[in-house]
Structures are given as C-alpha cells and as structure tokens.
Amino acid sequence: MKTLLAALLALASAGAVSAQVKIAVINTQKALLETDEIKKAQRDLEAKFKPRQDQMVKLQKDLQDIQTQLNSGKLNEVGTQELQTEGQRKQRELQRDQQDLQEDVERERTDILQRAGSRMQDAVKKLAEEKGLDIVVDTVNTVFYKPAFDITADATAAYNKAYPVGTGSK
C-alpha cells in the first residue's frame, strides 16, 4: 500500500496526473487458482495422494475396530494388553502417515504455486502492456475499486492462453 501511495505521489509531483493514469486491480490469488493449470494440478495431486489417504482411512477403521473390541469386555487381560499395544502402534503409524502426507502435499503445492505465481506475474505484465495500464494493484491492497477496473478474469484467460494445459506446461 505504501508503495502504491509513493508511486501515485511521484506521478502527481511529476505532473503526470494531467496525462490520464490507467489503473487496474486484480485478485491475484483468485486469478491463479482459477487457471486451468492449477485446476489440473489440484486434480493430479488428489489422484497421486489418494492411495495414501485410503491407507489412512483403513488405519482409522482398524483403530475403531480395536476400540470396539476393547470396549466389548470379552477379552481376557492378556488379549486386552495385546490389543492395546496393537492400537498404540497403529495410532503412531497413523500419526506419522498423516504428518508425512501433509508435508508431501504442502511441498508439492508450494512448488506448483511458486512456478504458477511467477508465470501469473508475467501474464499480468503482458496483459497490462496490451491494455496500456500504468499500474496494476492487487485487491488485497485496495480498500475500494469499481468492478470495471478488475482484470482478474482477463488475467486468468491470459495465463491459460500463455500456458495451456497439456502442452508441457510443467
């Protein structure tokens, strides 16, 4: 916000305000998340990690079954002890698997978003040049704007055109 204010003040002090300044706003996050590449990457991530998620669902069911058996009161002391040990082992395994999965998903998601974010900046810069814009501000830093100044959909379309899915966009 301070950078925008400084830029506007610099333009004003240079007398450039009399020459119409063209400003647009963009919701960069929304534009990025709506690209075909990000949508495909999300589907690919879900498919890639589904077997691990399914395994964790199975472990959770196993833990529920163990708890049901323990609550039944039909086990002797040795059986109860063995089942409790098995339950603790499965609980630790589940926690490790959940943490590993979360870290793996987050790492891949971060890589995808960083690459796509850089591409989005390039697409927005090119779009701004095509539209003759002087300043493009993210809506995160904007208190108010008229919808006519929003180029979010245009940026998504420009990104999809520049980086079509399925043509080596990775």
Describe the residue ranges of each PLM region:
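Bacterial N-terminal signal peptides
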Residues: 2, 6-14
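Amphipathic alpha-helical segments
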Residues: 20-142, 162-170
